Structures are given as structure tokens and as C-alpha cells.
Amino acid sequence: MERIKASVLLRGLAPDSMMFGEAEVSLVTTDSREVRPGCIFVAFPGERFDGHDFAAKALEEGALCVVVNHPVEGVPAEKSVLCPDSYHAMMVLGANYRSQFHPKVVGVTGSVGKTTTKQMCYAAIEGFGNTIKTEGNQNNELGLPRTMFRIGRDTEYAVVEMGMSHRGEIERLSRCARPDVGIITCIGVSHIGNLGSQENICKAKLEICAGLPEGAPLVLNGDDPFLRKAKLPEHVRPVWFSLGDESADVCALSIQQEADGMSFVLEDHEEGTFLVKIPAMGRHNVANALAAYCAATRLGLDARKVVRGIGNFEQTGMRQKVVHSKGIDVIEDCYNANPDSMKAALAMFKEYPCKRRFALLGDMLELGDLSREAHEEVGREAAESGLDTLITYGEQAKRTAVVAAAKGLTTLHANTYREAADALLKLMQPGDALLVKASRGMALEKVLELFYKEQP
């Protein structure tokens, strides 16, 4: 974080009567252990700890002021910036800081593929200048301001991921980040329990337009029926990408799955035709690559160099990471899951070169009333995916196993991580491949820890 006047950073939060003079701030923190002289400490109430309990100590250690939800005993009023919502306070601080710098910003949202697309955008752009990106899962109203604070005078580009659970969240994130280009990867059913329908999810994702300037490119998946039907704001310029539809602005043709990723021909009506290879499996990752390409080139960056950058992208965490373990290929995809990403992973795995295919699938969370139907649909997909055996874990995934078994697939339901690991150790042999996928909350990596440790 660059040094910035406190009066600028606190605009819209602190009343004019608070006198900060020429004081400058080089740190905004929510962690009392990080407090240093001249910083701003934002107190967050939590289940285990309440930041308000540390507000007085933060001032003792030199904080310029504290942002609190209510008056705190021992904290002078002249050092207290009152804001009933700590998340709102962070967003205002982040937006005020962002307004002082002028990098080109790509904003990425969508139901599936946000993080991979963010990584591909970063790979496409970083060769053109100093570039930052959202780290980890910092894609919400606490994490996005933290990303803004990492922008500096020498930052030329930023790739910012925007997540949501409810209407209005993407709008607030977009107004804070003020992207120059927006991406919506697709409209799925994640958080449908909160939003009610995919139409409402589409409206929520389109809130990214709130922070886009007049004439800004909005990169959209032309194969998504909800985006195709959506009414777009007049101030944005849609850029459509597609897997196979040559009428789209950018399309992928001759898509091939190879041992180490995907290859395809990219046709861009503006820039020409390119052969692209990406180190990621599945047609869905081709779509992610197209989105990243569209965003980078519509920023005015050289298309050939963008294509080379995308070819060097690196996946993060447990997202379709291929591990070669004692002759068995394990595709670790247990960071997150929803019906669309499950189907995409199974479609990819069906083409994976190996002797036998095994899948360990767990619950998909936050699906509300659609949960039973969605898990049963995954069971039908699994039965058509060329699997030798399906192992399931989790209460909802039982329905996946029941439906898959009814269609003739050999299935096994594990009630514990130990049972799942034992099944894999008993069944799998060198030359086989394993797909592991579930929502983050299912923690299927614990099965893999046992499996790797005890492989003969």
C-alpha cells in the first residue's frame, strides 16, 4: 500500500470535524497483530473474536484511528470513525484508495470458472507490465479492498475476481474496483438458494456493469442461454466468445484434448487466427481461455503475446491439478463444485487417457431446493462418463450413487474419509486415473492424504 492522506482515504466515512491534518496512512488492517504507528484499524465483530475488544490496544500501539461499529469504552471519540457495517467501511476505504491510481483493471465474475479465468487473465497480461491479481479467495467485500490496497504507483494492470452470495454484492465490488473490462464466465446454479432462479443469478452477475465506464468491453459467454437472453446495459460493449459458433466475436474451433491439456484454433474477427495450447483439461477451460484472451486483447494488448501468455498459465490450489502418484493419475479438483463444473469435469475425464477411470465425488453445497435434483443429474452424467467405479461421500452424494447404480454403474458410498481411502487403495492399480471433486466444505483432500500415504 502506498502512503495516502488519511483525509482522502476516510472520505465518506469520517465526518469533516475529524482533524487528520496532513497525516498519511500506509496500512489498513483488520488484524490487531499487524497494527503499526499511523495505520487505520478496522474492527470486525466475529464468532470467536470481536475486533472491538482490540480497538483501544490498537490506538495504544500507534494507530491513527479505529473504525468501529459503535462507541467503544476506552476509545476517544476523536479517534473513532463510526460505521455500523465494517464491510461497508472496508469497501469505502478500498474505493477511495483505488481512485488515486490508474491501472487497467479486469473484473471477473460468473458462476463457474472465475478463479481459473482470473489466472489465465493474469498469465495473458503480466508480460505487458507490472500486474497484480486477487490472491486466494479474496473475492468478497473484505478481500477485494485488500486487493485494492496492493495497487501501487507502478501497478499497470490488475485482475480482480468478484464473488457473491446475494444481489447487490457484485455492484458494490465493481464500483470499488472500477474495472476497464468485465468478464462473465457463465450463469450456473451456485447460490440459487439465495437468489431463487438462474435468471436472478444472471441479473446479479450483470451488476459488474455498474463499475464499468462508458463503452467498456463486457466479455460474455455466447454459449450461455441466460447471458444470450439478458438485457445488457447500453453503456457497455459486449464481446461474445463461443466454442464453435463462428458468428461470435471470438470462437474456438478444432478443440482437442491432449495428455497435458487442450489445443484449439482461436478465430478472432478483429485479430485473426491463432493455434492455442493450454495446460488445463476440458472444454470448459477452453472457454475460460477465450474469456481471458478477449479481455486482454480488448485492453489493446498484442494478440500473439496474449496467446503465448495464456499457454503458460498456472492453476491454483486443488483445481484440476494432475498428480502422478505411483503409476496412478489423480486429478485433484476438490476446491469447489456445482452441477455445471461437475458435468464439465466428468466430460473432461471421459476423454482422459488411462486404463480405468475412477471418480470420488462428494456433496455440492448451497444448492437449496435444487440439491436433490442436481445430485441425481450428476449421477446420470457419471453413468455415461466411462467410469469403472464411482465412489461417493456425503449425504447428498448418496443420491448421485443411487441414480448412477440404477443406470448400471458400479458404485460405493463411503461414510468416512477412511472408508473412501480404503476403497481407492483396494480398487486402483497403476495405469488407472482418479477424479476427485466436491464442494470445498467436504474436504476430500483428507481422503487423498490417506491414499497417498498408504499407496503400496
Where are these regions (language model features)?
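Residue-level signal for inorganic ion chemistry
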Residues: 9, 39, 58, 93, ...
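Short acidic/polar active-site loop segments enriched in Thr and Asp
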Residues: 64-65, 104, 156, 180, ...
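N-terminal leader/targeting and accessory segments in enzymes
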Residues: 1-92, 352-354, 380-381, 385-395, ...
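Acidic, Mg2+-coordinating active-site environments of NTP-dependent enzymes
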Residues: 68, 72-77, 183-330, 354-355, ...
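Peripheral docking tails and interdomain loops at the edges
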Residues: 413, 431-452
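Phosphate-binding loop of NTP-binding sites
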Residues: 10-11, 89-217, 222, 226-235, ...
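Active-site beta-alpha connecting loops in nucleotide-dependent enzymes
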Residues: 46-49, 316, 334-407, 456
